[in-house]
Swiss-Prot record:
InterPro entries per UniProt: TatA/B/E, TatA/E
Known function: Part of the twin-arginine translocation (Tat) system that transports large folded proteins containing a characteristic twin-arginine motif in their signal peptide across membranes. TatA could form the protein-conducting channel of the Tat system.
GO BP: protein transport by the Tat complex
Protein's recorded name: Sec-independent protein translocase protein TatAc
Organism phylogeny: Bacteria, Bacillati, Bacillota, Bacilli, Bacillales
Subunit structure as annotated in this protein's UniProt entry: Forms a complex with TatC.
Keyword Isomerase recorded: no
Entry's localization field: Cell membrane
Organism the protein comes from: Bacillus subtilis (strain 168)
Membrane topology: Single-pass membrane protein
Membrane keyword on record: yes
Family note: Belongs to the TatA/E family.
Length: 62
């Protein structure tokens, strides 16, 4: 699903209407922090999988 500029504006406008201008910055920070933590977790998981895969390949070669 591709988010165009118009769709992002609509989402922001609806968020502004639902949560109001006072809570919107805090929600944005919380969403950014959650996204950052998710990216770190998936990056760590990807590294673990690659490490285990390379170890398995080395074991098979021996």
């Amino acid at each position: 699903m591709e988010l165009s500029f118009t769709k992002i504006l609509v989402i922001l406008f609806v968020g502004f209407l639902v949560f109001g201008p006072d809570k919107l910055p805090a929600l944005g920070r919380a969403a950014g922090k959650a996204l950052s933590e998710f990216k770190q977790a998936t990056s760590g998981l990807t590294q673990d999988i690659r490490k285990n895969d390379s170890e398995n390949k080395e074991d098979k070669q021996m």
